[in-house]
Each structure stands twice: as structure tokens, then as C-alpha cells.
């Protein structure tokens, strides 16, 4: 009995499908549109029951929604100012105004955005304490356990100015006693006689001048150093004078006629002005006969 029931249910299903979608048997022209309209109406009612239909004029991409942009210019300027301030601060700003063609109220003007911290007005209204940089911003970023003196680094010490590097005299230094003219003359005469004194001579000489042995000893040491400096300066002068000097003709100086410089200049001029395959221009020679006074040698010398 079970196979018979299955066989009878199959033709019934096919019949229903054919009756719903296939053409009628009569094939009349006036009958097909009515059936199609009935089918479309039935499907539309099912979709409307499942999803509410939105008017075409309220869609975001409709012509009415695109042409219904009635926002005030003040709202645009506030949004632009806020976006520019946010871009300068490195943050992202989302527009709070109503988008054109939104489902809310397309014709309602968008309310101006309140001034934030990143807008120009917000920056101008901030107190001066907020605009001034904190003295130590690292303290704000630290956790409580880092702010404890045990874990926090010691405060930076201010560097004191460097101490004076000049040599300081001893506190117990004796004041300098100036020598009299008679003592200086006697010391100078004794130094010319003998630069080094023995202990006995120094004791006798210091007692005759009413000076201590230390004062006489130090004066002789300073006088020997001065004599050494003077001697080195004299030797340097002698070395400078002994070095050969440059010929005066090299500096273009003129001498009287018949002098050695005139002969050397004439020989050089004849040498360079001689005719040959590679002829050179004659060197300029100072007029010899214009100056009759003898010019001294220069102080320049060859090293």
C-alpha cells in the first residue's frame, strides 16, 4: 500500500506546479496577463510583509536627496575648521553633521559642531596654564610605583661654574719687602763680580746689607735667569745679522750708476732680451738714473 500512495502523490504535485506556472490549456491571449498580474501581486504582498518599503525619494542616491543639500554655510565652516585642527594634531575627525539624503530629515539644517580642543576657537579659549608645557611631563606618564623616590631617577643637578684655575698664593705668605736703591746697587755690583756665592760669602754679604740669606739667594737666582734671557736675545740678534741677505735688485730697488746692482740688472736684461728662436720679453728694470740716493738693504733674509 505504501508504493501506491507515493505514486498517487507525485502526479498531484506536478499538477499543482503546472497549474501555477504553465500556460492555460485554452491558450487565450486575454487570460495570460491576468494570471501574471495575480502572481506578481501575491509575491509583492509577501515581500511587503517581510520588509518595509522605503520611498524612492528618501534613498541616499536619489535625485531629490542629492538636490536637497540645504545646510547652512556656518555649519560647513565649523566642520572644516574642526577637521583642519584635527589633521594638524594628528587625529581623525568624523563629521557629525547630517549627510545629504540620510533617512532622518534631509531638509533639516545640520547643527554646528561644538568647539572642541582641536578647533581654533577651542584653542583660543583654553587657559594659559594648559598652553604652557609642563616642566617635567615624564612625571605624568609614570605609574605610582615609578614616582616613588626609590625607583625614580635622582633630579638633575645644576652644574656649578668652573672654579678659577689661577694659582692661589698661600695664606701665610709673607709680604714682599722692596729693596732700597743702595741695596740694589750693592747686589748688582756683587753679581758682576761673582754670580754664585758660597754660604759664608752669602751670610757675610746679607748681614752687611741688613737682609736675610734667603732674600739674597732668591735675588741672585732671579738675576741669573734674567742674564740668561738677555744672553739668548743677543745670540739671536747675531744669528740674524750673520745670515745672507737677499740682493736688493730682487725688490726692484735702484742704486747709483756704476754700482753692483746696476751691472747685475744690465746683465740680466741683456740675457733675456737676446734674440733667438724662443725670444722672451725683457724683464722690467727700474730706471737707474732717476735715483741718486743710496737705498739701504732690506731686513728680509733667506731661511
Curated annotation (Swiss-Prot):
Keywords assigned by UniProt, alphabetized: Developmental protein, DNA-binding, Homeobox, Isopeptide bond, Nucleus, Repressor, Transcription, Transcription regulation, Ubl conjugation
SUPFAM superfamilies to which the protein is assigned, alphabetical: Homeodomain-like (SSF46689)
Cross-link (Glycyl lysine isopeptide (Lys-Gly) (interchain with G-Cter in SUMO)), chain numbering: 15, 133
Example GO BP: heart development
Phenotypic consequence of residue 15 to R: Abolishes sumoylation. No effect on interaction with PIAS1
Disruption phenotype: Knockout mice die shortly after birth. Development of mesenchymal molar tooth buds is arrested at the bud stage, as a result of reduced expression of Bmp4 and Lef1 in the dental mesenchyme at 13.5 and 14.5 dpc, there is no change in expression in the dental epithelium. Decrease in the expression of the Wnt signaling gene Tcf7, and an increase in Dkk2, Sfrp1 and Sfrp2 in the mandibular molar tooth mesenchyme at 13.5 dpc. Expression of Dkk2 and Sfrp2 expands into the distal tooth mesenchyme in mandibular molar tooth buds at 13.5 dpc.
Annotated region of DNA binding: 172-231
Record region (Disordered): 22-53, 90-112, 135-163
GO molecular function, one term: sequence-specific DNA binding
PTM (free text): Sumoylated by PIAS1, desumoylated by SENP1. Sumoylation of Lys-15 and Lys-133 not required for interaction with H1-5, transcriptional repression, inhibition of myoblast differentiation, or binding to gene promoters.
Assigned GO CC terms: nuclear periphery; nucleoplasm; nucleus; transcription regulator complex
Biased composition (Low complexity): 32-44
Compartments where located: Nucleus
CDD domains: homeodomain
Major localisation: nucleus
InterPro entries listed in its UniProt record: HD, HD_metazoa, Homeobox_CS, Homeodomain-like_sf, Msh_Homeobox_Regulators
Subunit: Interacts with CREBBP/CBP, TBP and SP1; interaction with these transcription activators may inhibit autoinactivation. Interacts (via C-terminus) with PIAS1 (via N-terminus); the interaction is required for the localization of both proteins to the nuclear periphery and specific binding of MSX1 to the core enhancer region in target gene promoters. Interacts with H1-5.
Function: Acts as a transcriptional repressor. Capable of transcription autoinactivation. Binds to the consensus sequence 5'-C/GTAAT-3' in downstream activin regulatory elements (DARE) in the gene promoter, thereby repressing the transcription of CGA/alpha-GSU and GNRHR. Represses transcription of myoblast differentiation factors. Binds to core enhancer regions in target gene promoters of myoblast differentiation factors with binding specificity facilitated by interaction with PIAS1.
Annotated family: Belongs to the Msh homeobox family.
Descriptive protein name: Homeobox protein MSX-1
Species of origin: Mus musculus
Amino acid at each position: 500500500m505504501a508504493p501506491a500512495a507515493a505514486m498517487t502523490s507525485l502526479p498531484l504535485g506536478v499538477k499543482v506546479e503546472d497549474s501555477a506556472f504553465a500556460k492555460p490549456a485554452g491558450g487565450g491571449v486575454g487570460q495570460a496577463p491576468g494570471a501574471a498580474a495575480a502572481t506578481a501581486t501575491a509575491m509583492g504582498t509577501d515581500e511587503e510583509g517581510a520588509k518595509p518599503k522605503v520611498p524612492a525619494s528618501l534613498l541616499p542616491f536619489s535625485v531629490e536627496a542629492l538636490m536637497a543639500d540645504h545646510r547652512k554655510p556656518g555649519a560647513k565652516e565649523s566642520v572644516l575648521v574642526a577637521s583642519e585642527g584635527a589633521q594638524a594634531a594628528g587625529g581623525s575627525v568624523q563629521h557629525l553633521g547630517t549627510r545629504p539624503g540620510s533617512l532622518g530629515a534631509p531638509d533639516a539644517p545640520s547643527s554646528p559642531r561644538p568647539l572642541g580642543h582641536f578647533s581654533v576657537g577651542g584653542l583660543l579659549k583654553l587657559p594659559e596654564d594648559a598652553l604652557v608645557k609642563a616642566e617635567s611631563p615624564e612625571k605624568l606618564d609614570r605609574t605610582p610605583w615609578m614616582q616613588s623616590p626609590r625607583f625614580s631617577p635622582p633630579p638633575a643637578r645644576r652644574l656649578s661654574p668652573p672654579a678659577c684655575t689661577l694659582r692661589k698664593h698661600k695664606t701665610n705668605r709673607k709680604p714682599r719687602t722692596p729693596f732700597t736703591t743702595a741695596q740694589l746697587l750693592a747686589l748688582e755690583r756683587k753679581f758682576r763680580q761673582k754670580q754664585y756665592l758660597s754660604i759664608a760669602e752669602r751670610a757675610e754679604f746679607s748681614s752687611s746689607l741688613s737682609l736675610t740669606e734667603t732674600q739674597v739667594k732668591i735675588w741672585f737666582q732671579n738675576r741669573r735667569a734674567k742674564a740668561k734671557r738677555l744672553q739668548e736675545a743677543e745670540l739671536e740678534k747675531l744669528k740674524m745679522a750673520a745670515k745672507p741677505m737677499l740682493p736688493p735688485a730682487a725688490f726692484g730697488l735702484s742704486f747709483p750708476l756704476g754700482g753692483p746692482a746696476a751691472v747685475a740688472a744690465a746683465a740680466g736684461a741683456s740675457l733675456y732680451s737676446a734674440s733667438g728662436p724662443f725670444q722672451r720679453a725683457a724683464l722690467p728694470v727700474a730706471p737707474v738714473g732717476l735715483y741718486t740716493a743710496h737705498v739701504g738693504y732690506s731686513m728680509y733674509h733667506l731661511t
